[in-house]
Amino acid sequence: PDNLCVTPRGALLINEDNDSSNPQRMVGMDMDGRTFAFAESNVVLAGERGFTGDFRYEEWCGVCFSADGRWLFANCYAPGFTVAITGPWANGPL
C-alpha cells in the first residue's frame, strides 16, 4: 500500500500503489480485519480543462477525513486532483 487512513469509526482505508495493469484502488478494512474494495480510479479525460489521458493506473494518495467525519478527501497523483466523497458512512463498515 502507498498510504492509509484511520476512519472516524476506527476502520482503515488503504491506498494501492502498484505496477499492475489494473486500475488503482482504495481498499477498506473493517474492525474485524475483513477487506473490501471501496473505490477504483476510473479517470479517463478527453481534453476537459486541458487534460487528456488515461489516469486509471495513477495512484490514490493523501486520503483523509474532514474534522467532522462527513467528507473523505482523496488525491489522484496524476494529473493531480482532489475528490471529496460523502457517505452515508453510518450505513457501512467505514
PLM regions: where:
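Sequence/structural signature of beta-propeller domains
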Residues: 1-94
